[in-house]
Protein backbone atom coordinates (compact mmCIF):
# COMPACT_ATOMS: atom_id res chain seq x y z
CA UNK A 1 0.00 0.00 0.00
CA UNK A 2 1.14 3.51 -0.77
CA UNK A 3 -0.08 5.87 1.98
CA UNK A 4 0.54 9.54 1.26
CA UNK A 5 -0.57 12.55 3.29
CA UNK A 6 0.03 15.93 1.65
CA UNK A 7 -0.42 18.91 3.99
CA UNK A 8 -1.80 22.09 2.44
CA UNK A 9 0.74 24.52 3.79
CA UNK A 10 3.95 22.57 3.17
CA UNK A 11 5.84 22.37 -0.04
CA UNK A 12 7.60 19.07 0.68
CA UNK A 13 6.52 15.74 -0.61
CA UNK A 14 4.44 13.42 1.47
CA UNK A 15 5.96 10.97 3.91
CA UNK A 16 6.63 7.61 2.35
CA UNK A 17 6.79 4.56 4.53
CA UNK A 18 8.80 1.56 3.46
CA UNK A 19 7.86 -1.62 5.13
CA UNK A 20 9.98 -4.82 5.15
CA UNK A 21 9.19 -8.02 3.28
CA UNK A 22 6.64 -10.03 5.09
CA UNK A 23 6.62 -7.64 8.04
CA UNK A 24 3.29 -5.96 7.58
CA UNK A 25 0.94 -8.08 9.66
CA UNK A 26 -2.04 -5.74 10.21
CA UNK A 27 -4.51 -7.37 12.52
CA UNK A 28 -7.89 -5.93 13.45
CA UNK A 29 -10.42 -7.20 15.88
CA UNK A 30 -14.09 -6.29 15.60
CA UNK A 31 -15.30 -9.22 17.66
CA UNK A 32 -13.67 -11.86 19.77
CA UNK A 33 -13.57 -14.37 16.91
CA UNK A 34 -13.15 -12.04 13.93
CA UNK A 35 -9.64 -11.29 12.59
CA UNK A 36 -8.15 -9.81 9.46
CA UNK A 37 -6.00 -11.82 7.15
CA UNK A 38 -3.03 -10.05 5.71
CA UNK A 39 -1.11 -11.37 2.75
CA UNK A 40 2.61 -11.95 3.22
CA UNK A 41 3.39 -11.55 -0.44
CA UNK A 42 4.24 -7.82 -0.50
CA UNK A 43 6.49 -6.40 -3.14
CA UNK A 44 8.63 -3.28 -3.13
CA UNK A 45 8.15 -0.78 -5.92
CA UNK A 46 9.71 2.48 -6.73
CA UNK A 47 7.67 5.69 -7.13
CA UNK A 48 9.25 7.88 -9.81
CA UNK A 49 8.15 11.10 -8.05
CA UNK A 50 8.72 10.66 -4.35
CA UNK A 51 11.17 7.79 -4.06
CA UNK A 52 10.34 4.61 -2.24
CA UNK A 53 6.83 3.40 -1.61
CA UNK A 54 5.31 0.20 -0.40
CA UNK A 55 2.51 -1.58 -2.22
CA UNK A 56 0.54 -4.06 -0.17
CA UNK A 57 -2.32 -6.31 -0.99
CA UNK A 58 -4.72 -6.37 1.92
CA UNK A 59 -7.81 -8.44 2.14
CA UNK A 60 -10.31 -7.21 4.73
CA UNK A 61 -13.48 -9.04 5.65
CA UNK A 62 -15.40 -6.13 7.12
CA UNK A 63 -14.17 -3.00 5.40
CA UNK A 64 -17.27 -0.80 5.55
CA UNK A 65 -16.95 -0.26 9.31
CA UNK A 66 -13.25 0.57 9.05
CA UNK A 67 -13.86 2.98 6.18
CA UNK A 68 -16.44 4.96 8.11
CA UNK A 69 -14.24 5.10 11.22
CA UNK A 70 -11.24 6.23 9.22
CA UNK A 71 -13.19 8.87 7.36
CA UNK A 72 -14.56 10.33 10.58
CA UNK A 73 -11.07 10.44 12.04
CA UNK A 74 -9.58 12.08 8.95
CA UNK A 75 -12.02 15.01 8.88
CA UNK A 76 -10.50 18.40 9.72
CA UNK A 77 -12.85 21.45 9.38
CA UNK A 78 -15.08 19.64 6.93
CA UNK A 79 -12.23 18.62 4.57
CA UNK A 80 -10.74 15.16 4.68
CA UNK A 81 -7.01 14.54 4.65
CA UNK A 82 -5.76 13.21 1.41
CA UNK A 83 -5.06 9.65 2.40
CA UNK A 84 -4.58 7.42 -0.59
CA UNK A 85 -4.26 3.70 -0.23
CA UNK A 86 -3.57 1.95 -3.46
CA UNK A 87 -3.07 -1.65 -4.25
CA UNK A 88 -1.10 -2.41 -7.38
CA UNK A 89 -0.13 -5.79 -8.80
CA UNK A 90 -2.93 -7.72 -7.13
CA UNK A 91 -1.85 -11.11 -5.87
CA UNK A 92 -4.14 -14.07 -5.85
CA UNK A 93 -3.52 -16.77 -3.28
CA UNK A 94 -6.19 -19.23 -4.15
CA UNK A 95 -9.14 -17.22 -2.89
CA UNK A 96 -11.44 -14.63 -4.45
CA UNK A 97 -9.65 -11.74 -2.71
CA UNK A 98 -7.47 -11.04 -5.72
CA UNK A 99 -10.50 -10.91 -7.98
CA UNK A 100 -12.18 -8.32 -5.73
CA UNK A 101 -9.07 -6.19 -5.76
CA UNK A 102 -8.82 -6.50 -9.52
CA UNK A 103 -12.44 -5.38 -9.81
CA UNK A 104 -11.67 -2.01 -8.25
CA UNK A 105 -12.55 -2.69 -4.59
CA UNK A 106 -8.93 -2.40 -3.43
CA UNK A 107 -9.13 1.25 -2.21
CA UNK A 108 -9.70 0.90 1.50
CA UNK A 109 -8.77 2.92 4.56
CA UNK A 110 -7.48 1.32 7.75
CA UNK A 111 -6.22 2.46 11.11
CA UNK A 112 -2.66 2.51 9.87
CA UNK A 113 -3.63 5.30 7.49
CA UNK A 114 -5.08 7.29 10.35
CA UNK A 115 -1.93 6.86 12.38
CA UNK A 116 0.25 8.03 9.53
CA UNK A 117 -2.06 10.95 8.73
CA UNK A 118 -1.68 12.44 12.23
CA UNK A 119 2.05 12.07 12.63
CA UNK A 120 3.81 14.77 14.72
CA UNK A 121 5.46 16.12 11.59
CA UNK A 122 2.13 16.89 9.89
CA UNK A 123 1.10 20.56 10.39
CA UNK A 124 -1.95 21.11 12.64
CA UNK A 125 -2.49 24.74 11.58
CA UNK A 126 -2.99 25.02 7.84
CA UNK A 127 -4.93 28.23 7.13
CA UNK A 128 -6.16 31.49 8.64
CA UNK A 129 -9.36 31.06 10.67
CA UNK A 130 -11.57 33.30 12.81
CA UNK A 131 -13.07 32.51 16.19
CA UNK A 132 -16.78 31.64 15.85
CA UNK A 133 -17.87 34.61 17.97
CA UNK A 134 -15.56 37.18 16.38
CA UNK A 135 -17.16 40.19 14.72
CA UNK A 136 -16.22 38.95 11.24
CA UNK A 137 -17.57 35.42 11.67
CA UNK A 138 -20.47 35.67 14.14
CA UNK A 139 -23.14 36.21 11.49
CA UNK A 140 -21.85 33.33 9.37
CA UNK A 141 -22.25 30.81 12.19
CA UNK A 142 -25.34 28.86 13.14
CA UNK A 143 -26.66 29.85 16.57
CA UNK A 144 -29.35 27.20 16.88
CA UNK A 145 -27.94 26.01 20.20
CA UNK A 146 -27.98 29.51 21.70
CA UNK A 147 -31.51 29.97 20.40
CA UNK A 148 -32.56 26.78 22.18
CA UNK A 149 -30.83 28.03 25.33
CA UNK A 150 -32.79 31.29 25.16
CA UNK A 151 -36.04 29.35 24.87
CA UNK A 152 -35.15 27.19 27.87
CA UNK A 153 -34.20 30.25 29.94
CA UNK A 154 -37.36 32.08 28.84
CA UNK A 155 -39.56 29.15 29.86
CA UNK A 156 -37.76 28.78 33.20
CA UNK A 157 -37.93 32.48 34.08
CA UNK A 158 -41.57 32.86 33.10
CA UNK A 159 -42.52 29.69 34.95
CA UNK A 160 -40.97 31.12 38.10
CA UNK A 161 -42.80 34.42 37.60
CA UNK A 162 -46.13 32.63 37.13
CA UNK A 163 -45.62 30.61 40.31
CA UNK A 164 -44.58 33.75 42.20
CA UNK A 165 -47.63 35.63 40.91
CA UNK A 166 -50.01 32.85 41.94
CA UNK A 167 -48.43 32.61 45.40
CA UNK A 168 -48.61 36.37 45.91
CA UNK A 169 -52.00 37.31 44.40
CA UNK A 170 -53.81 33.99 44.06
CA UNK A 171 -56.11 33.05 41.19
CA UNK A 172 -57.55 36.33 39.88
CA UNK A 173 -59.46 34.96 36.89
CA UNK A 174 -63.21 34.79 37.41
CA UNK A 175 -65.77 32.74 35.53
CA UNK A 176 -66.82 34.57 32.40
CA UNK A 177 -64.16 37.23 32.88
CA UNK A 178 -64.43 38.44 29.27
CA UNK A 179 -68.18 38.06 28.80
CA UNK A 180 -70.01 39.71 31.63
CA UNK A 181 -73.78 39.75 31.98
CA UNK A 182 -73.77 43.36 30.85
CA UNK A 183 -71.93 42.54 27.63
CA UNK A 184 -74.47 39.82 26.88
CA UNK A 185 -77.29 42.33 27.36
CA UNK A 186 -75.83 44.71 24.74
CA UNK A 187 -78.55 43.77 22.27
CA UNK A 188 -78.45 47.13 20.42
CA UNK A 189 -74.84 46.42 19.43
CA UNK A 190 -75.77 42.90 18.38
CA UNK A 191 -78.63 44.19 16.27
CA UNK A 192 -76.36 46.79 14.73
CA UNK A 193 -73.82 44.10 13.82
CA UNK A 194 -76.54 41.94 12.25
CA UNK A 195 -77.79 44.84 10.12
CA UNK A 196 -74.39 45.70 8.64
CA UNK A 197 -74.94 43.43 5.57
CA UNK A 198 -77.56 45.93 4.40
CA UNK A 199 -74.81 48.24 3.17
CA UNK A 200 -73.08 45.71 0.85
CA UNK A 201 -76.51 44.85 -0.56
CA UNK A 202 -77.15 48.54 -1.28
CA UNK A 203 -73.75 48.83 -2.98
CA UNK A 204 -74.62 45.85 -5.18
CA UNK A 205 -77.90 47.48 -6.22
CA UNK A 206 -76.03 50.65 -7.19
CA UNK A 207 -73.56 48.66 -9.29
CA UNK A 208 -76.39 46.85 -11.04
CA UNK A 209 -78.08 50.16 -11.84
CA UNK A 210 -74.94 51.60 -13.38
CA UNK A 211 -74.36 48.38 -15.35
CA UNK A 212 -77.85 48.72 -16.81
CA UNK A 213 -77.05 52.39 -17.50
CA UNK A 214 -79.95 53.66 -15.38
CA UNK A 215 -77.75 56.16 -13.51
CA UNK A 216 -74.73 58.23 -14.48
CA UNK A 217 -71.22 58.00 -13.08
CA UNK A 218 -71.45 61.07 -10.77
CA UNK A 219 -74.65 59.69 -9.23
CA UNK A 220 -72.90 56.35 -8.66
CA UNK A 221 -70.06 58.04 -6.79
CA UNK A 222 -72.49 60.03 -4.65
CA UNK A 223 -74.53 56.96 -3.72
CA UNK A 224 -71.44 54.94 -2.84
CA UNK A 225 -70.17 57.81 -0.70
CA UNK A 226 -73.44 57.86 1.22
CA UNK A 227 -73.47 54.07 1.67
CA UNK A 228 -69.87 53.78 2.89
CA UNK A 229 -70.20 56.76 5.24
CA UNK A 230 -73.40 55.39 6.74
CA UNK A 231 -71.79 51.96 7.21
CA UNK A 232 -69.17 53.62 9.43
CA UNK A 233 -71.19 56.27 11.28
CA UNK A 234 -74.15 54.04 12.11
CA UNK A 235 -72.18 51.77 14.52
CA UNK A 236 -70.44 54.81 16.03
CA UNK A 237 -73.82 56.37 16.82
CA UNK A 238 -75.15 53.13 18.36
CA UNK A 239 -72.08 52.63 20.58
CA UNK A 240 -72.07 56.20 21.86
CA UNK A 241 -75.81 56.12 22.50
CA UNK A 242 -75.94 52.77 24.31
CA UNK A 243 -72.90 53.18 26.61
CA UNK A 244 -71.88 49.56 26.16
CA UNK A 245 -68.91 47.70 27.60
CA UNK A 246 -65.55 48.17 25.92
CA UNK A 247 -65.19 44.66 24.48
CA UNK A 248 -68.57 44.71 22.73
CA UNK A 249 -67.88 48.17 21.33
CA UNK A 250 -64.44 47.20 20.03
CA UNK A 251 -65.87 44.11 18.32
CA UNK A 252 -68.61 46.11 16.60
CA UNK A 253 -66.20 48.85 15.48
CA UNK A 254 -63.82 46.27 14.02
CA UNK A 255 -66.67 44.77 11.99
CA UNK A 256 -67.77 48.23 10.86
CA UNK A 257 -64.25 49.20 9.76
CA UNK A 258 -63.84 45.94 7.85
CA UNK A 259 -67.16 46.50 6.07
CA UNK A 260 -66.14 50.07 5.18
CA UNK A 261 -62.78 48.97 3.77
CA UNK A 262 -64.42 46.21 1.73
CA UNK A 263 -67.07 48.57 0.37
CA UNK A 264 -64.44 51.09 -0.69
CA UNK A 265 -62.49 48.34 -2.47
CA UNK A 266 -65.68 47.06 -4.12
CA UNK A 267 -66.62 50.53 -5.35
CA UNK A 268 -63.12 51.48 -6.50
CA UNK A 269 -62.50 48.18 -8.29
CA UNK A 270 -65.81 48.28 -10.15
CA UNK A 271 -65.17 51.88 -11.16
CA UNK A 272 -61.77 50.91 -12.55
CA UNK A 273 -63.21 47.88 -14.36
CA UNK A 274 -65.85 50.08 -16.00
CA UNK A 275 -63.12 52.45 -17.16
CA UNK A 276 -61.07 49.55 -18.56
CA UNK A 277 -64.12 48.12 -20.30
CA UNK A 278 -64.72 51.44 -22.02
CA UNK A 279 -61.07 51.59 -23.10
CA UNK A 280 -61.28 48.06 -24.50
CA UNK A 281 -64.46 48.85 -26.39
CA UNK A 282 -62.78 51.87 -27.93
CA UNK A 283 -59.75 49.79 -28.90
CA UNK A 284 -57.31 51.77 -26.75
CA UNK A 285 -56.36 48.72 -24.65
CA UNK A 286 -56.18 45.04 -25.59
CA UNK A 287 -57.99 42.63 -23.24
CA UNK A 288 -55.04 40.23 -23.22
CA UNK A 289 -52.74 42.95 -21.87
CA UNK A 290 -54.79 43.31 -18.67
CA UNK A 291 -54.69 40.98 -15.69
CA UNK A 292 -58.43 41.27 -15.13
CA UNK A 293 -61.70 39.69 -16.14
CA UNK A 294 -63.40 40.92 -19.28
CA UNK A 295 -66.19 41.62 -20.07
CA UNK A 296 -67.12 43.66 -17.01
CA UNK A 297 -69.97 42.12 -15.00
CA UNK A 298 -71.53 42.49 -11.55
CA UNK A 299 -72.18 39.27 -9.64
CA UNK A 300 -73.88 39.00 -6.27
CA UNK A 301 -72.12 35.69 -5.66
CA UNK A 302 -68.68 37.28 -6.02
CA UNK A 303 -69.70 40.11 -3.66
CA UNK A 304 -71.04 37.69 -1.04
CA UNK A 305 -67.85 35.63 -1.16
CA UNK A 306 -65.74 38.77 -0.92
CA UNK A 307 -67.59 40.04 2.18
CA UNK A 308 -66.74 36.89 4.15
CA UNK A 309 -63.33 36.12 2.61
CA UNK A 310 -60.16 36.98 4.57
CA UNK A 311 -59.20 39.85 2.27
CA UNK A 312 -59.95 43.54 1.90
CA UNK A 313 -59.28 43.78 -1.85
CA UNK A 314 -62.16 42.94 -4.16
CA UNK A 315 -61.78 40.96 -7.35
CA UNK A 316 -64.22 38.87 -9.31
CA UNK A 317 -62.36 35.59 -8.67
CA UNK A 318 -59.73 34.36 -6.23
CA UNK A 319 -57.30 31.43 -6.19
CA UNK A 320 -59.07 28.49 -4.55
CA UNK A 321 -57.81 25.29 -2.97
CA UNK A 322 -59.11 21.87 -3.99
CA UNK A 323 -60.71 20.77 -0.72
CA UNK A 324 -61.22 21.55 2.97
CA UNK A 325 -58.91 19.83 5.45
CA UNK A 326 -61.32 19.17 8.31
CA UNK A 327 -58.79 17.65 10.70
CA UNK A 328 -56.46 20.60 10.12
CA UNK A 329 -59.29 23.02 10.93
CA UNK A 330 -59.98 21.18 14.19
CA UNK A 331 -56.33 21.42 15.22
CA UNK A 332 -56.25 25.14 14.50
CA UNK A 333 -59.44 25.67 16.51
CA UNK A 334 -57.87 23.89 19.48
CA UNK A 335 -54.81 26.14 19.19
CA UNK A 336 -57.07 29.19 18.97
CA UNK A 337 -58.85 28.24 22.19
CA UNK A 338 -55.55 27.57 23.99
CA UNK A 339 -53.87 30.83 22.98
CA UNK A 340 -57.01 32.83 23.71
CA UNK A 341 -56.94 31.37 27.21
CA UNK A 342 -53.25 32.26 27.56
CA UNK A 343 -54.03 35.81 26.48
CA UNK A 344 -56.85 36.07 29.04
CA UNK A 345 -54.61 34.67 31.79
CA UNK A 346 -51.92 37.27 31.14
CA UNK A 347 -54.45 40.10 31.05
CA UNK A 348 -56.17 39.12 34.31
CA UNK A 349 -53.12 38.00 36.28
CA UNK A 350 -50.58 40.61 35.17
CA UNK A 351 -51.85 43.55 33.14
CA UNK A 352 -54.92 44.42 35.22
CA UNK A 353 -53.05 44.47 38.58
CA UNK A 354 -50.24 46.56 37.07
CA UNK A 355 -52.51 49.22 35.60
CA UNK A 356 -54.71 49.33 38.72
CA UNK A 357 -51.67 50.00 40.90
CA UNK A 358 -50.30 52.70 38.59
CA UNK A 359 -50.91 56.39 38.13
CA UNK A 360 -51.46 58.49 35.02
CA UNK A 361 -48.19 58.41 33.03
CA UNK A 362 -48.40 62.16 32.31
CA UNK A 363 -48.95 63.06 35.97
CA UNK A 364 -46.96 62.48 39.14
CA UNK A 365 -43.46 61.05 39.52
CA UNK A 366 -41.59 60.51 36.24
CA UNK A 367 -39.44 57.63 37.51
CA UNK A 368 -42.52 55.84 38.86
CA UNK A 369 -44.25 56.24 35.50
CA UNK A 370 -41.20 54.83 33.68
CA UNK A 371 -41.11 51.88 36.09
CA UNK A 372 -44.80 51.14 35.45
CA UNK A 373 -44.35 51.36 31.68
CA UNK A 374 -41.37 48.99 31.73
CA UNK A 375 -43.16 46.58 34.06
CA UNK A 376 -46.18 46.58 31.79
CA UNK A 377 -44.15 46.19 28.59
CA UNK A 378 -43.37 42.47 28.92
CA UNK A 379 -46.90 41.14 29.61
CA UNK A 380 -48.30 43.60 27.08
CA UNK A 381 -45.84 42.27 24.50
CA UNK A 382 -46.93 38.70 25.24
CA UNK A 383 -50.59 39.64 24.80
CA UNK A 384 -49.84 41.45 21.57
CA UNK A 385 -47.94 38.44 20.18
CA UNK A 386 -50.75 36.09 21.21
CA UNK A 387 -53.27 38.41 19.57
CA UNK A 388 -51.25 38.45 16.37
CA UNK A 389 -50.91 34.66 16.33
CA UNK A 390 -54.58 34.06 17.15
CA UNK A 391 -55.99 36.48 14.59
CA UNK A 392 -53.54 36.68 11.69
CA UNK A 393 -52.37 33.08 11.72
CA UNK A 394 -55.05 30.92 13.31
CA UNK A 395 -58.36 32.67 12.66
CA UNK A 396 -57.61 33.96 9.15
CA UNK A 397 -56.22 30.57 8.12
CA UNK A 398 -59.26 28.79 9.55
CA UNK A 399 -61.55 31.14 7.63
CA UNK A 400 -59.48 30.72 4.47
CA UNK A 401 -59.59 26.93 4.79
CA UNK A 402 -63.36 26.86 5.24
CA UNK A 403 -63.81 29.13 2.20
CA UNK A 404 -61.00 27.41 0.23
CA UNK A 405 -59.32 30.79 -0.12
CA UNK A 406 -55.92 30.18 -1.71
CA UNK A 407 -53.82 33.29 -1.06
CA UNK A 408 -52.92 33.00 2.64
CA UNK A 409 -50.12 35.52 2.84
CA UNK A 410 -51.72 37.36 5.76
CA UNK A 411 -48.35 38.47 7.13
CA UNK A 412 -44.67 38.32 6.35
CA UNK A 413 -41.58 38.15 8.56
CA UNK A 414 -42.24 41.49 10.28
CA UNK A 415 -40.19 40.38 13.31
CA UNK A 416 -37.07 40.85 11.14
CA UNK A 417 -38.03 44.41 10.19
CA UNK A 418 -35.03 46.76 10.17
CA UNK A 419 -37.12 49.94 10.05
CA UNK A 420 -40.59 51.03 11.11
CA UNK A 421 -41.54 51.47 7.46
CA UNK A 422 -40.59 47.88 6.73
CA UNK A 423 -42.64 46.69 9.70
CA UNK A 424 -45.79 48.40 8.43
CA UNK A 425 -45.25 46.74 5.04
CA UNK A 426 -44.94 43.25 6.50
CA UNK A 427 -47.09 42.72 9.56
CA UNK A 428 -50.66 43.21 8.23
CA UNK A 429 -50.77 42.20 4.58
CA UNK A 430 -54.56 42.56 4.01
CA UNK A 431 -54.48 46.20 5.17
CA UNK A 432 -51.15 46.84 3.42
CA UNK A 433 -52.50 45.57 0.09
CA UNK A 434 -55.63 47.70 0.55
CA UNK A 435 -53.54 50.80 1.30
CA UNK A 436 -51.26 50.24 -1.69
CA UNK A 437 -54.13 49.50 -4.04
CA UNK A 438 -56.65 52.17 -3.01
CA UNK A 439 -54.62 54.94 -1.32
CA UNK A 440 -50.92 54.96 -2.19
CA UNK A 441 -50.84 54.30 -5.94
CA UNK A 442 -53.97 56.35 -6.72
CA UNK A 443 -52.20 59.27 -5.03
CA UNK A 444 -49.10 58.71 -7.15
CA UNK A 445 -51.16 58.46 -10.34
CA UNK A 446 -52.71 61.83 -9.52
CA UNK A 447 -49.30 63.50 -9.23
CA UNK A 448 -49.01 63.50 -5.43
CA UNK A 449 -45.39 63.12 -4.20
CA UNK A 450 -44.36 59.83 -2.62
CA UNK A 451 -43.78 61.34 0.83
CA UNK A 452 -47.22 62.95 0.86
CA UNK A 453 -48.81 59.68 -0.28
CA UNK A 454 -47.17 57.85 2.64
CA UNK A 455 -48.40 60.58 5.01
CA UNK A 456 -51.96 60.20 3.68
CA UNK A 457 -51.80 56.42 4.20
CA UNK A 458 -50.69 56.87 7.81
CA UNK A 459 -53.40 59.49 8.32
CA UNK A 460 -56.12 57.06 7.18
CA UNK A 461 -54.66 54.33 9.40
CA UNK A 462 -54.55 56.72 12.38
CA UNK A 463 -58.23 57.63 11.94
CA UNK A 464 -59.32 54.00 12.02
CA UNK A 465 -57.12 53.17 15.02
CA UNK A 466 -58.70 56.08 16.87
CA UNK A 467 -62.21 54.95 15.93
CA UNK A 468 -61.63 51.37 17.06
CA UNK A 469 -60.31 52.47 20.48
CA UNK A 470 -61.71 55.90 21.30
CA UNK A 471 -65.35 55.20 20.38
CA UNK A 472 -65.78 52.04 22.54
CA UNK A 473 -63.95 53.77 25.44
CA UNK A 474 -65.90 57.03 24.93
CA UNK A 475 -62.58 58.88 25.19
CA UNK A 476 -61.65 61.30 22.44
CA UNK A 477 -58.19 62.49 23.40
CA UNK A 478 -56.57 61.25 20.17
CA UNK A 479 -53.99 59.04 21.92
CA UNK A 480 -54.23 56.33 19.23
CA UNK A 481 -54.27 58.91 16.44
CA UNK A 482 -51.15 60.60 17.81
CA UNK A 483 -49.46 57.24 18.32
CA UNK A 484 -49.93 56.26 14.67
CA UNK A 485 -48.95 59.67 13.31
CA UNK A 486 -45.77 59.53 15.43
CA UNK A 487 -44.79 56.56 13.29
CA UNK A 488 -44.00 59.00 10.45
CA UNK A 489 -40.97 60.60 12.18
CA UNK A 490 -39.97 57.14 13.42
CA UNK A 491 -39.98 55.99 9.79
CA UNK A 492 -37.59 58.82 8.89
CA UNK A 493 -35.36 58.20 11.93
CA UNK A 494 -35.07 54.44 11.46
CA UNK A 495 -34.48 54.82 7.71
CA UNK A 496 -31.69 57.31 8.45
CA UNK A 497 -30.08 55.03 11.04
CA UNK A 498 -30.34 52.04 8.73
CA UNK A 499 -28.67 53.93 5.88
CA UNK A 500 -25.97 55.27 8.18
CA UNK A 501 -24.97 52.15 10.11
CA UNK A 502 -25.87 49.53 7.47
CA UNK A 503 -26.63 47.15 10.31
CA UNK A 504 -29.91 45.26 10.30
CA UNK A 505 -29.57 44.31 13.98
CA UNK A 506 -29.48 47.95 15.13
CA UNK A 507 -32.59 48.86 13.16
CA UNK A 508 -34.45 45.79 14.37
CA UNK A 509 -33.65 46.57 18.02
CA UNK A 510 -34.78 50.19 17.59
CA UNK A 511 -38.04 48.97 16.08
CA UNK A 512 -38.72 46.57 18.96
CA UNK A 513 -37.92 49.19 21.58
CA UNK A 514 -40.02 52.04 20.23
CA UNK A 515 -42.95 49.99 19.06
CA UNK A 516 -43.39 47.25 21.66
CA UNK A 517 -41.46 48.28 24.77
CA UNK A 518 -42.29 51.99 24.91
CA UNK A 519 -45.23 52.80 22.64
CA UNK A 520 -47.91 50.20 23.37
CA UNK A 521 -47.60 50.15 27.20
CA UNK A 522 -47.80 53.95 27.22
CA UNK A 523 -51.04 53.87 25.21
CA UNK A 524 -52.51 51.20 27.50
CA UNK A 525 -51.82 53.30 30.61
CA UNK A 526 -53.16 56.47 29.00
CA UNK A 527 -56.44 54.91 27.94
CA UNK A 528 -56.88 52.97 31.18
CA UNK A 529 -56.54 55.99 33.44
CA UNK A 530 -58.72 58.14 31.22
CA UNK A 531 -61.32 55.37 31.23
CA UNK A 532 -61.19 55.07 35.03
CA UNK A 533 -61.51 58.84 35.40
CA UNK A 534 -64.53 58.82 33.09
CA UNK A 535 -66.20 56.03 35.06
CA UNK A 536 -65.51 57.87 38.31
CA UNK A 537 -67.19 61.01 37.01
CA UNK A 538 -70.25 59.16 35.69
CA UNK A 539 -70.72 57.25 38.94
From Swiss-Prot:
This is Diacylglycerol O-acyltransferase 1. Residues 56-80 have a biased composition (Basic and acidic residues). Major contributor to triacylglycerol (TAG) synthesis and oil accumulation in developing seeds. Catalyzes the acylation of the sn-3 hydroxy group of sn-1,2-diacylglycerol using acyl-CoA. Has a marked preference for oleoyl-CoA as substrate. Belongs to the membrane-bound acyltransferase family. Sterol o-acyltransferase subfamily. It is found in: Endoplasmic reticulum membrane. The active site is at 465. The keyword Metal-binding does not apply. One of its GO terms (biological process) is triglyceride biosynthetic process. Residues 1-104 are annotated as: Disordered. It is a multi-pass membrane protein. The keyword Transcription regulation does not apply. It catalyses: an acyl-CoA + a 1,2-diacyl-sn-glycerol = a triacyl-sn-glycerol + CoA. Its EC number is 2.3.1.20. It comes from the Eukaryota. Keywords: Acyltransferase, Endoplasmic reticulum, Glycerol metabolism, Lipid biosynthesis, Lipid metabolism, Membrane, Transferase, Transmembrane, Transmembrane helix. A motif (FYXDWWN motif) lies at residues 410-416. One of its GO terms (cellular component) is endoplasmic reticulum membrane. Residues 33-52 have a biased composition (Polar residues). The chain crosses the membrane at residues 143-163, 187-207, 219-239, 244-264, 294-314, 334-354, 383-403, 451-471, 473-493, 506-526. InterPro entries: Diacylglycerol_acylTrfase1 (IPR027251), MBOAT_fam (IPR004299), Oat_ACAT_DAG_ARE (IPR014371). Pfam families: MBOAT. Pathway: Glycerolipid metabolism; triacylglycerol biosynthesis. It is an enzyme of class 2 (transferase). GO terms for molecular function: diacylglycerol O-acyltransferase activity.
Amino acid sequence: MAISDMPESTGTTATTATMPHGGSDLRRRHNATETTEVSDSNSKTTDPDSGNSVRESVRVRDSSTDESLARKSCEDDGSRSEVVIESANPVTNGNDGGEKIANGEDRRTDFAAVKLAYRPSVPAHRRIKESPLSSDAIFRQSHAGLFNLCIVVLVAVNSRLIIENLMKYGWLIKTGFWFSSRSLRDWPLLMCCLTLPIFPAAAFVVEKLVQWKYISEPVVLLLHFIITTAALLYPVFVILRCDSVVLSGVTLMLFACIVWLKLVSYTHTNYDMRALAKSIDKGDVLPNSLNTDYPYSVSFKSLAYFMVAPTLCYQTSYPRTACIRKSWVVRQLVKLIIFTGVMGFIIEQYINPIVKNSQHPLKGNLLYAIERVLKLSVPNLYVWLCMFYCFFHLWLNILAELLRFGDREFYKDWWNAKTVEEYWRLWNMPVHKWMVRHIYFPCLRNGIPKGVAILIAFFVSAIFHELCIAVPCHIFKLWAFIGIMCQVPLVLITNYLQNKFRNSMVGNMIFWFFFCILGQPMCVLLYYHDLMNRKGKTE
